[in-house]
Amino acid sequence: MDKKNRKPHQLIDDIYSIGCWITGSKEDAAELIEKTYLIIDPEATEIDVFKTFRHCLLDSLKGISCIPKPSCNDMEKLGYKLIKQDAEMKLTVLLAEISGLSPEIISKIMGNSVKEVNYWLSTGRTRFSSDLLLLNGRSKKSR
């Protein structure tokens, strides 16, 4: 299928795959798809669909913190910012790898400069490969 000018219904598989990778859960990915498609216009552009998906993803992270029982509000905000940054980096890489989007288009979706998107792509790909190597190492040890 041509990856240019896709309609919203043609993006469901990409969004589901991205949602699974980011959340680690098929149920959470399906919920993100449902929320995204309840908001978008059936004739929305590809960029608008992915922007809406990003909004739904970040909205689902609100209230989550990587710092257990933060002792102050600032620590809770820091924890959320770390989780959000991690999700943004993963989303950037997955938009490029799964959907085949260019850094220019990703920058429009993410609201960042192309330079920042390229940095996140480089850093994020390195992190993904390191994480996968760690997971493969653990699974081989458990055999």
Language-model features and meaning:
Residues 1-17, 41, 45-46, 90:
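A short, charge-rich alpha-helical start-of-domain segment used by transcription regulators
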Residues 26-43:
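Conserved RNAP core-binding helix
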Residues 40, 57-65, 128, 132:
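Hydrophobic recognition helices of helix-based DNA-binding modules
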Residues 46-72:
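Arg/Lys-rich amphipathic alpha helix in sigma70-family domain 2
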Residues 68, 76-86, 108:
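Short amphipathic alpha-helical boundary/capping segments
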Residues 84-105, 109:
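Short amphipathic alpha helix immediately N-terminal
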Residues 110-143:
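DNA-recognition helix of helix-turn-helix
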